[in-house]
Amino acid sequence: MGRTLENKQQIVEELKQLLGEAEMALVLDYKGLSIKEMSDLRGRLAANGICKVTKNTLMRRAIDGNDTWSDLDPLLTGTNAFVLVKGDVGGAVKAVQSFQKDSKKSELKGGLFEGRLLSQNDIKAIGDLPSKEGLMAQIAGSINAVATKLAVGVNEVPSGLARALQQHADSENS
């Protein structure tokens, strides 16, 4: 039995709400994936987003008139699962890439981030970036290194002067 018009409208509204909260959308060809594998993907994405399987026509209606997501339209062909990411974009991309590596069945068609259509290479580059916490640790380490070098440099001036005076005094005594 097909879906009723009211049911379809409800799905479109839910998609619009999810897209409103999302920062990134990935389009994944899920052909050949079992229910267990889809559940695995959803579990991996739980912290950073959701995986939604819906008809392309319903997604097309959800993005219609929305400038942020309208560029997704060319990707809406075939059997698609939509990964809607909020929060840690890099973490979600890494979760999808890890899932693809493990399942070897799905293909990432592309995605959309900040109104820009992403190719597979763009998505791979995002996945290769360190996490937000990793970047913050690198920045903190760099700032700490500068402070340490400054402290050593400031401390070295009087020490160097003292060594030079001591050397001069030793040479005078000899």
UniProtKB/Swiss-Prot annotation:
Keywords: Ribonucleoprotein, Ribosomal protein, RNA-binding, rRNA-binding. It holds the Pfam family Ribosomal_L10. The keyword Protein biosynthesis does not apply. One of its GO terms (biological process) is translation. InterPro entries: Ribosomal_uL10, Ribosomal_uL10-like_sf, Ribosomal_uL10_bac, Ribosomal_uL10_bac_type. HAMAP family: Ribosomal_uL10 (MF_00362). This is Large ribosomal subunit protein uL10. It comes from Synechococcus sp. (strain RCC307).
